[in-house]
Curated annotation (Swiss-Prot):
UniProt gene name: RPL13
Entry superkingdom: Eukaryota
InterPro entries according to UniProt: Ribosomal_eL13, Ribosomal_eL13_CS
Region (Disordered), start-end ranges: 183-202
GO cellular component term, pick one: cell surface
KW Cytoplasm (keyword) present: yes
Family under the similarity heading: Belongs to the eukaryotic ribosomal protein eL13 family.
Pfam family, one: Ribosomal_L13e
Function per UniProt: Component of the ribosome, a large ribonucleoprotein complex responsible for the synthesis of proteins in the cell. The small ribosomal subunit (SSU) binds messenger RNAs (mRNAs) and translates the encoded message by selecting cognate aminoacyl-transfer RNA (tRNA) molecules. The large subunit (LSU) contains the ribosomal catalytic site termed the peptidyl transferase center (PTC), which catalyzes the formation of peptide bonds, thereby polymerizing the amino acids delivered by tRNAs into a polypeptide chain.
Protein name: Large ribosomal subunit protein eL13
Keyword presence, Mitochondrion: no
One of the GO biological process terms: translation
Origin species: Candida albicans (strain SC5314 / ATCC MYA-2876) (Yeast)
Length: 202
């Protein structure tokens, strides 16, 4: 704040034991280890369910990045309806749902429906009557590794650069010049014809 009027000059009064409140990160390595242990504990707790949820394949926004596809937040309600899975039930079987996302591309819609159908075909669901020994025989998987997001192959490859004989620019330039110098060219041609006629008379 600027100095103004007959008021006392502002000053920061850091006298509240600020040295005790300085935040440091000396435990960075320890935190990393504890986060890893936490992930392992969570994975063991939910086993043999997948570690993560199935995500849709979406095209990245903006002109800069829309050439690539990536994993999205969740499947749309329309995509789930096409496969015949209720949104609430989808969350219980490891499928992420995003009710806000809208399908604006038929290509992406079809790709995600196929992704859901593939996941559904490989899904194993246990009921309460299933024995623990049967459950333990199944291996816990990482969904993002089992169903990876693959970049689509380009439809057309690189083409050779060909320079045509007639270009639009060249055609327009010739037409413009023809219009611009039409009168003077006609005048010169007329003068030349008259000169030749006089020469022939002599």
């Amino acid at each position: 704040m600027a100095i103004s009027k007959n008021l006392p000059l502002l000053n920061n009064h850091f006298r509240k034991h600020w040295q005790e409140r300085v935040r440091v990160h000396f435990d960075q390595a320890g935190k990393k280890a504890s986060r890893r242990q936490s992930r392992l504990r969570k994975a063991a707790k939910i086993a043999p369910r997948p570690i993560d949820a199935l995500r849709p394949v979406v095209r990245a926004p903006t002109v800069k990045y829309n050439r690539k596809v990536r994993a999205g937040r969740g499947f749309t309600l329309a995509e789930l309806k096409a496969v015949g899975i209720a949104p609430k039930y989808a969350r219980t079987i490891g499928i992420s749902v995003d009710h806000r996302r809208q399908n604006k591309s038929q290509e992406t819609f079809d790709a995600n429906v196929a992704r859901l159908q593939e996941y559904k075909s490989k899904l194993v669901i246990f009921d309460k009557k299933t024995k623990a020994s049967e459950v333990a025989s199944f291996e816990q998987v990482d969904v993002s590794a089992t169903f990876p997001v693959e970049q689509p192959a380009p439809e057309s490859g690189l083409r050779a650069v060909e320079v045509p004989e007639q270009t639009a620019y060249r055609t327009l330039r010739l037409a413009r010049n023809e219009k611009k110098y039409k009168g003077i060219r006609e005048k010169r041609a007329k003068e030349k014809a008259e000169a030749e006629a006089e020469k022939a008379k002599k």
